[in-house]
UniProtKB/Swiss-Prot annotation:
Residues 65-143 are annotated as: Domain II. The gene is ruvA. Keywords: Cytoplasm, DNA damage, DNA recombination, DNA repair, DNA-binding. It comes from Pseudomonas fluorescens (strain SBW25). It is found in: Cytoplasm. This is Holliday junction branch migration complex subunit RuvA. Disulfide bonds: none annotated. Residues 1-64 are annotated as: Domain I. The RuvA-RuvB-RuvC complex processes Holliday junction (HJ) DNA during genetic recombination and DNA repair, while the RuvA-RuvB complex plays an important role in the rescue of blocked DNA replication forks via replication fork reversal (RFR). RuvA specifically binds to HJ cruciform DNA, conferring on it an open structure. The RuvB hexamer acts as an ATP-dependent pump, pulling dsDNA into and through the RuvAB complex. HJ branch migration allows RuvC to scan DNA until it finds its consensus sequence, where it cleaves and resolves the cruciform DNA.
Length: 203
């Protein structure tokens, strides 16, 4: 089991990234809440990881903190929740928001996540309620950075394209993803910030 990796952030292609560890490139899939907190490409970073071994693939998931990684592990223990749905939940809502939704048994918070209908949301909330009693809600660890410098047109188009691709990978329909990104008025955002704003608009 690979529990943690420390290296240089080599590539970011939401929701995937490449982490260079002593010349070996590890491809990881990360939730958007981790993507928002990543440093620039070329910077060092430590990620907590979870490895899923299948007959046809070995999939590595990365998280900015151990708490997020442990939360992911709690989610995939639930009946009918695989890594894809767990990442969609953690990308649409921060860990503390999910904990609050479970505490309040708020189905509406979960049904806005692609792939989660009312019955699924109700079942998840019931199953999670006892599991999450020990989870403490803490202040948000990150926020959107305002007043970013203008980006060249080519970078804007690339950021928008990356944001749309990331939303589609989370389960949103291409039309929904494109509409959500197009609705963002500030075009001088990175792909990570575009994804975050688009998700807030959808939820």
């Amino acid at each position: 089991m690979i529990g943690r990796l420390r290296g240089t952030l080599a590539e970011k292609q939401p929701p995937h990234l490449i982490l260079d560890v002593n010349g070996l490139g590890y491809e990881l899939e990360v939730p958007m809440t981790t993507l928002y907190r990543l440093p620039s490409v070329g910077e060092p970073i430590t990620l907590h990881t979870h490895l899923v071994v299948r007959e046809d693939a070995q999939l590595l998931y990365g998280f900015i903190g151990k708490r997020d990684r442990d939360f992911f592990r709690e989610l995939i223990r639930l009946n009918g929740v695989g890594p894809k749905l767990a990442l969609a939940l953690m990308s649409s809502l921060e860990v503390d928001e999910l904990v609050r939704a479970v505490s309040a048994q708020d189905t509406s918070a979960l049904t806005k996540v692609p792939g989660v209908g009312k019955k699924t949301a109700e079942r998840l909330l019931v199953e999670l309620k006892d599991r999450f009693k020990a989870w403490e809600v803490v202040p948000s660890m990150f926020a959107l950075v305002p007043n970013q410098p203008d980006m060249p047109a080519g970078q804007v188009a690339s950021a928008e394209s990356d944001a749309v691709s990331a939303l589609i990978s989370l389960g949103y329909k291409p039309q929904e993803a494109s509409k959500a990104v197009s609705a963002i008025k500030d075009k001088n955002l990175s792909s990570e910030d575009m994804i975050r704003r688009a998700l807030k608009g959808m939820i």
